[in-house]
Amino acid sequence: MRLPRILVALAVTAAVGSTACGAEVQQPAGAATGAAVTVTNCGAPLTVEGVPERVVTNDTGITEMMFALGLADRLVGHTSYPGKERDIASSPWKADFERTPLLGDAFTREVVQAADPDFVFAGWNYGFKESTGLTPDWVRSIGAVPYQLTEACRQPGTDRRGVMEPLDALYTDLANLGDIFGVRARADQLIAQYRDQVAKAAAGAPAGQEPARVFLFDSATAEPFTSGRHAAPSQIIREAGGSNIFDDLNDSWTTASWEAAAQRDPQAILIVDYGAGPENSVQAKIEQLRTHPLMAGTTAVRENNLLALPYAALVEGPRNPQAVVTVAEFLRSRGY
């Protein structure tokens, strides 16, 4: 079926490609001195004794942060999710993925322990879950350091996630990793580049015009899974000149309702492309929107203002700044 005026951006690579290879990464200072480094991670001090040498990561965006910092040689392996091949194919760090052992599509205690890591980088609902017993405390129990993705830090006294602006979470993790691995100059270079990229995209938003209402559609069974205020898409949309219709939800990735989504009448819809299975494909999600009795009448669906971006562009990671550029260009092309 021909889908007019639907832009499916399978790769967010143009502006991040320059950071994907050829970076001169300084020798970690801790490798020579053995000095301990303490950073703040999810509101608590985290001390790392020396530079980690056997790192396990979970999820594409997390792994790409290590690659962007030039730390591929520190990884003993990574885990991902079924269908990640599309994410990896579109990655500016594809060559690093090909050189790094894939430990599997499941982040489990058995997989992690078998890799004998000294540092595990994951996040709540990005691998860490009480239901599986794979938690930061368990990582400590096997003698490794757990580092938590800042986008997924839990708010005090609750399991809701998000304690700062999503892009600030990215910059925080890059700076922390820079300190831990002795590559802070590289981290600062990336942070400055990303801030500049985002600022230039934000400056292009039309003056005197209400931001476009944007719905982030991740997936759905009974109700849609979407981005609240603290997930990366909310700030990506805002910096691009739009407004996340669920920015009032004090969480990161969370469940909303079709009724609420339709009532807020999105003018554009941002679709997460997992590249996984026919039931979770971009095409299937588009058909779901077009045939849904409430969503079919929204401005975004009627006018085919639908943009798909790779999963790794929309979770915290080094593709976020280019995602801002891509969403901004899309909104401008639709008159917003």
Q: How should each PLM-predicted stretch be described?
A:
Residues T108-F119, L134-D137, I142, A256-D265:
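Short helices/loops that flank or line small-molecule/ion binding pockets
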Residues M164-D173, D248-L249, L270-Y336:
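Structured C-terminal subdomain patch of bacterial secreted/periplasmic proteins
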Residues K84-E85, Y126-L134, A144-N176, Q209-A232:
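Extracytoplasmic ligand-binding site segments that recognize negatively charged/polar headgroups
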Residues R2-M65, N176-F217, S333-Y336:
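Bacterial Sec-exported substrate-binding components of ABC uptake systems
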Residues T226-W253:
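Alpha-helical, coiled-coil/dimerization segments enriched in small aliphatic residues
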Residues G61-E64, Y81-K84, F119, N125-K129, ...:
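Solvent-exposed loop/turn segments at secondary-structure junctions
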Residues R54, D59-A115, F119-V120, W124-F128, ...:
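A short, structured surface patch at a secondary-structure boundary
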Residues N41-G43, T100-E110, E130, N250-S257:
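Short helix-initiation/N-cap motifs at beta->coil->alpha
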